Amino acid sequence: MKRSNTKIMASGPITSWEIDGKTMETVSDFIFLGSKITTDNDCSHEIKRRLLLGRKVMTKLDSIFKSRDITLPTKVHQVKATVFPVVMYGCESWTVKKAERQRIDAFELWCWRKLFRVPWTARRSNQSILKEISPGISFEGIMLKLKLQYFGHLMRRVDSLEKTLMLGRIGSRRRRGW
């Protein structure tokens, strides 16, 4: 373990940590396996970060989307295969609130509008764009499907801590008055 590169993050009352007399640097967030972990366990930062990464991928594919040689269904498949997975990485553990849901819907429609090269000033309804693309299932629907698949995966496991936590069967007694 290299002390100069090692940092700690604590979600409890621990404020500092010493190893061999040297205090370790404390951080409030870090990226672990591609996901942003914060001390307050709020996933809104991670959702915003993922949406920004999706925007970067979408803008890098701009030359493909402007090409007249590629058909619209191929472009739609390209978005679903390259942009959406970048955004949805780790979405099974997200707690999506109303504000994040609106951001996700806005991102999906931004992708489709960029695909059609419809400027934001154009008076074209979102429904007409969705009707023309006919994506089948919305971005939010895909995320819900992934969450349910993960939940089913957890429930099929025989003796796992995750299943016990999800079902609320922790073997302890409640304190009086709780």
PLM feature spans:
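Short linear motifs embedded in intrinsically disordered, charge-biased segments
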Residues: 1-178
